[in-house]
Amino acid sequence: SDNPLILHVPNSESIKPLVTEVSTTAQALMDSFWPGPLTITLPKSDLVPDRATGGLPRVALRCPNHDGCRLLLQRAGIPIAAPSANISGRPSPTTAQDVYNDMNGRISYILDAGPCTIGVESTVVEVHDDKVIILRPGGITKAQLETVVSTVEYDTALVNAETKPKAPGMKYTHYAPDAPMTVV
């Protein structure tokens, strides 16, 4: 598949075997926004399979802001590739009931650890030296990123549908509810 996944980790220390380098800028972002809704893409090590990155040379990493999730990741002892629990192209669920409504009959179990505190995806960024490129807007804003890094830009692929996705959430439409709409 050419659609990269996010590898979830329990803390910033656990990314070391997964990447070939962590710049001071990337470390500053992790120190400021992890755990939380920030996904950082970094050059991947040989331990990360191409199917997890959509064949890209970078891996998307996130440390979720949920104690139960981080405990699960710690006990698993490996990163977990975890897309949103929804049908691709549909809005991301914020409660177990949302997951049930969207995925009913498609999955065997739902782990209900309470509702999400943020109803949007994580912000996905690519770090180059002291510059941050937003690949997918989400729970961390450009202004918040600029409190840590002086140069923050939006990726041009956000407005060009022909570009190969560089990060999770760029290939398919997000926030696409199945509802009628009237334009007045």
Report the location of each language-model feature.
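Active-site-adjacent structural elements in enzyme catalytic cores
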Residues: 1-184
